A protein has these predicted regions:
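Conserved active-site-adjacent core of cysteine acyl-enzyme catalytic domains
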Residues: 45, 49-124, 146
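Residues in intrinsically disordered, low-complexity segments of regulatory proteins
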Residues: 5, 75-76, 163, 178
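Cys-His-centered catalytic/binding microenvironment captured across papain-like cysteine peptidases
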Residues: 121-124, 133-192
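Active-site-adjacent structural segments surrounding the nucleophilic cysteine of cysteine proteases
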Residues: 1-70
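Residue-level detector of short, conserved catalytic/binding motifs and their immediate flanks
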Residues: 41, 114, 125-127, 139
Length: 192
């Protein structure tokens, strides 16, 4: 996976051979860190894969071998580690919620082509914006959440107070949790 993302020259000591990769020490350390982070959740990979399947009109994941789906989820999850994606995330997080509304709208208009990351109390979660509607000072973003794939959830942004709220519900309507934040620093929008 790391060779796919960063290239053999960045990962292996034996760049000029066709032998199995002998990883650089830094690559081994990164792989360990990578595995630890991957163990905490794969929502980014699930979100990106869902967007790709939707955009490309591909075969639904339920009709593909589990190993192939898992490999794709891990790959797309790992892309958030790429320097260009990490830089976009940092830039996006520096903006107020109201400043992200247009980027969210562009992703929705293009056919669900951006991820929306939310950060709250040292946790993070990624969802796929699929609709957007302005209601006065509030913007209601309909999202696909891989934790509740059968139903559309909503994230609400108050453009006046700069507060966003995400309270996903289960099939019975029970609120699973509530995340809320005021100001910049806790949302990112990453175009695919």
């Amino acid at each position: 996976l790391l060779i796919q993302l960063f290239g053999r020259a960045s990962i292996c000591t034996n760049v000029s051979t066709n032998d199995p990769c002998i990883p650089l020490q830094s690559a081994e350390q990164f792989a360990t860190q990578f595995e630890d982070q991957l163990a905490t959740g794969r929502c980014e990979g699930l979100t990106v894969l869902a967007a790709k399947i939707h955009a490309e009109g591909g075969t639904p994941a339920s009709l593909v071998a589990a190993e192939a789906v898992s490999t794709n989820i891990d790959y797309w999850w790992a892309t958030q580690m790429l320097p260009s994606v990490a830089a976009k995330s940092r830039l996006s997080r520096s903006l107020k919620p109201s400043q992200l509304v247009n980027e969210i709208r562009q992703g929705v208009v293009r056919g669900a082509t951006s991820t929306l990351g939310m950060y709250f109390q040292n946790k993070g979660h990624s969802v796929l914006p699929i609709s957007i509607q302005k209601k006065g000072e509030k913007v209601v973003v309909g999202v696909y959440d891989s934790n509740t794939p059968e139903m559309t959830q909503t994230l609400t942004i108050n453009t006046k107070t700069q507060v966003w709220v995400y309270s996903p519900v289960d099939k019975t309507g029970k609120v699973l949790f509530t995340w809320r934040h005021k100001g910049a620093g806790a949302l990112d929008v990453i175009p695919l």
